[in-house]
Amino acid sequence: MKERKFVNEAVKRLLVYEYLVKETENAGFGKMSMKRTPFGTNITLYVNRPGLVIGRRGSKVQQMTETLEKKYAIETPQIEVKDVKDPDLNPSVIAKKIALSLEKGWSYRKAGNTSLKRTIDAGARGVLIKISGKISGERARYQKFIYGNVKYSGEPGSKGMLVGFSTAKLKVGILGVTVKILNPEYKLPDVFSISNLAGGENVGTESETDKADEQGREAANTEES
């Protein structure tokens, strides 16, 4: 019984997430946090353009609140809208920008490289941008734009990488855009420091991540079919 309740709650949370992403995608959806309290359910939306989500006199927020309560059975939902702190380091915002650029007629290379450079300039330690679909010709394939330290597996891959996804609707079909960024606050397990035991002074640091950043300042683009 507990397992079924847990599954139902997870499904409800996913449906709420999908609904809010759809409602706020034009405002540059960044992320969402949802927390139950004794007074109701607090939902915080991080977007690139908060004004579009709030609406005139809070009309948009009021409409979403009513939908969450009636359609999704969320108890006393309270929505708070906040600005994304670093939009150029938020994978969801970046993925949406790339999708919009593709829909405006940008080539996939221009859209990918431009976003990659902007993310690098913002201070990202590792970035992966993947555009998939019929990007050129009739055959579906994908193009990757990679920079710095990107983790694919283990705890660094699941907890250290922030992931965002969006789609671009073109005449040739739908293109998928996936963006992964190494969380600036995540400490990689291969990072360690050497301290002066006598005085407790930090005398040096060593990290494979730092080496990768120094050696890979230029983005490496890879293409596969």
From Swiss-Prot:
Keyword RNA-binding present in the record's keywords: the answer is: yes
* A single cellular component GO annotation: cytosolic small ribosomal subunit
SMART domains recorded? KH
Question: Has the keyword Ribonucleoprotein been applied to this entry?
Answer: yes
GO molecular function per UniProt: rRNA binding; structural constituent of ribosome
Q: Which UniProt keywords apply?
A: Ribonucleoprotein, Ribosomal protein, RNA-binding, rRNA-binding
User: What InterPro entries does the database record attribute to this sequence?
Assistant: KH_dom (IPR004087), KH_dom-like_a/b (IPR015946), KH_dom_type_2 (IPR004044), KH_sf_prok-type (IPR009019), Ribosomal_S3_C_sf (IPR036419), Ribosomal_uS3_arc (IPR027488), Ribosomal_uS3_C (IPR001351), Ribosomal_uS3_euk/arc (IPR005703)
Question: Which residue ranges are recorded for the region named Disordered?
Answer: 200-225
Please state every residue range assigned to the domain named KH type-2: 16-85
> Which stretches are tagged as biased composition: Basic and acidic residues?
208-217
Protein's GO biological process: translation
* Organism superkingdom: Archaea
PROSITE patterns from the UniProt entry: KH_TYPE_2
Q: What does this protein do, in the record's words?
A: Binds the lower part of the 30S subunit head.
Protein family: Belongs to the universal ribosomal protein uS3 family.
Q: How does it assemble?
A: Part of the 30S ribosomal subunit.
Cite the HAMAP family for this sequence: Ribosomal_uS3_A
Q: What protein am I looking at?
A: Small ribosomal subunit protein uS3
